[in-house]
Amino acid sequence: MAKEEEEFKATMKIEILEEDKFKVRFILYDAPIAFANSFRRAMKSLVPVMAVDYIDVYLNSSYLFDENLAHRIGLIPIKTELDRFNLPENCVCGGEGCPNCQVSFRLNVEGPKVVYSGDFVSDDESIKPAFDNIPIIELFKGQQLMIEAVARLGTGKEHSKFQPVSICAYKIIPEIDIKDSCNNCNACVEACPRGVFENKNGKIVVKDVLSCSMCMECVKSCEEDAIELTETNNYLFTVEGVGQLPVKKVMIEALKIIREKASEMNKLIEELV
């Protein structure tokens, strides 16, 4: 087992295919499927980000109940600086609340107007809603809101509002072997719903292996049994961020967390042995 782990360490790598502010597509090469799934789970559930934990409502003359407002406000993504704040359970204040683990936002608005996330005023200029144009409620004439919201770090394992990514999925990239017995009948080209194959100069070839979903329609359609699909240790990931952190930062933090957890497990095993 140790030898297999060393082989994976030596060959495992990531290739970025597509990257923008909110989305990254990449290939994870030569990794066990257990690691690929751990990576996915860590990005979604273990990387901490800021979100509103609770609100104090001083005045609400709108048509919406306080708890409905709290729910909407809690789901607003907030820009996060992990190097400046602690998780409540790791803070010197013991989770009671201090500038090292929480930030307060104030909202004081009067209708008629649509209240947006950008109307909140933060105690910390660098910690604010990731988007200013998220609508919260429409106030009519005479209606008013006075609210203080307190944000802290948390993880998606605790609540979905702390998830730094929305889409975080991977699929296995197969190895597709077209044997010499192929008679180039085009049956696989017509059967494949994703356009993986093409007839090039009278010969069937793989055009886009990354689009393959391993639905096996090509194998079923081939009367010559000339197509063989084999699972590999390569995975195509698609990750979309919510806005609190850059997606690449989420990836890096997730890998750090996996390493820390692996180190903790090694220590526990050594103690038992």
Show where each model-derived region lies.
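Protein-protein interaction/assembly regions in multi-subunit complexes
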Residues: 1-273
